[in-house]
């Protein structure tokens, strides 16, 4: 029975150590380039502007005018 407690303690300590080794977080820098109906492919438009963006996505914001969907480009930085 004592060896099970020892093994579980070792696993808990090891997992806590791994938490400190993992980087804090990965943040995405974004720039919105226009409404989605203006671009046929938001992903291709973001990669095509050659500012180092990794991907693009149509994002829905609060409904303002007619089209709430905006094409936003993202760049992942560690």
UniProtKB/Swiss-Prot annotation:
A UniProt-annotated Pfam family: AtDEF-like
Disulphide-bonded residues: 32-73, 36-58, 42-71, 46-72
Signal peptide (UniProt feature, chain positions): 1-28
Key words, A-Z: Antimicrobial, Disulfide bond, Fungicide, Plant defense, Secreted, Signal
GO biological process assignments: defense response to fungus; killing of cells of another organism
Presence of keyword Kinase: no
Listed GO CC annotations: extracellular region
InterPro entries: DEFL (IPR010851)
Chief location category: secreted
Compartments where found: Secreted
Record family assignment: Belongs to the DEFL family.
Protein's recorded name: Defensin-like protein 74
Organism of derivation: Arabidopsis thaliana (Mouse-ear cress)
Gene that encodes it: LCR43
